[in-house]
Curated annotation (Swiss-Prot):
PANTHER family: URIDYLATE KINASE, URIDYLATE KINASE PUMPKIN, CHLOROPLASTIC
Organism annotation: Streptococcus suis (strain 05ZYH33)
Name of the protein in its database record: Uridylate kinase
Role summary: Catalyzes the reversible phosphorylation of UMP to UDP.
Source organism phylogeny: Bacteria, Bacillati, Bacillota, Bacilli, Lactobacillales
Assembly, per entry: Homohexamer.
One MF term in the entry's GO annotations: ATP binding
């Protein structure tokens, strides 16, 4: 069997990815299909953590722009990420995958509190860990949550699963037919070019902690496994020089 390129990964899913074609809410069939993809990777012995956004249920910034207190709006969004985490955890458990949800805001009736040592223990035992409620503080995105948790659990890579986009381009490929895809980039290039893969805080965290970032199309079955085993798909962002 091929040796995996990455042995411990954190998968970042957007909330919208759980919504299916509707674009809002949670489409259970879509979540179940994603869970199946993740299960196949877990069965290869890969240690997996997940961070899921909440944009399918709530967005804090537009709510704040409409007059809602920004802190309250962000906390509302954090609760949305917990809803997504619980649904994904249930879908994984129904496939026989041992899964734990840990939240940055304590809610003992539905999830464990986030404790780094416990999360590491779960991963070492082959359990999938889903991190919910962001980092527990307003003004921080789920991209930043993904970068922070990846650093804390010493993940080899963050897999940015994108909806219908197969990597990073120099322009929006949906609007510009001449857009060119990057196969490799450095974290510093992403920041200096202002490429919107993650927000600046998340990009800097990934760079400072030497965590690879792989951006790929999650709609293609088997792509998570392909990334883990080193197939050249999507765009890989790392601290390595482009000239290897």
């Amino acid at each position: 069997m091929m040796k995996p390129k990455y042995e411990r990964i954190l998968i970042k899913l957007s909330g919208e990815a759980l919504a299916g074609e509707r674009g809002v809410g949670i489409d259970l069939k879509t979540v179940q299909e994603m869970a199946k993809e993740i299960q196949e990777v877990a069965e290869s012995g890969i240690q997996i953590a997940l961070v899921i956004g909440g944009g399918n249920l709530w967005r804090g910034e537009p709510a704040a722009e409409a007059g809602m207190d920004r802190v309250q709006a962000d906390y509302t969004g954090m609760l949305g990420t917990v809803m997504n985490a619980l649904v994904m955890a249930d879908s994984l458990k129904q496939l026989g995958v041992d899964t734990r949800v840990q939240t940055a805001i304590a809610m003992q009736s539905v999830a464990e509190p986030y404790i780094r040592g416990r999360a590491l223990r779960h991963l070492e035992k082959g359990r999938i860990v889903i991190f919910g409620a962001g980092i527990g503080s307003p003004y921080f995105s789920t991209d930043t949550t993904a970068a922070l948790r990846a650093a804390e659990i010493e993940a080899d890579a963050i897999l940015m699963a994108k909806n219908g986009v197969d990597g990073v381009y120099n322009a929006d490929p949906k609007k510009d037919a001449n857009a060119v895809k990057f196969n490799e980039l450095t974290h510093r290039e992403v920041i200096s070019r202002g490429l919107k893969i993650m927000d600046a805080t998340a990009s800097t965290l990934s760079m400072d902690n030497d965590i690879d970032l792989v951006v790929f199309n999650m709609n293609e079955p088997g792509n998570i496994k392909r990334v883990v085993f080193g197939e050249p798909i999507g765009t890989t962002v790392s601290n390595s020089s482009e000239e290897k």
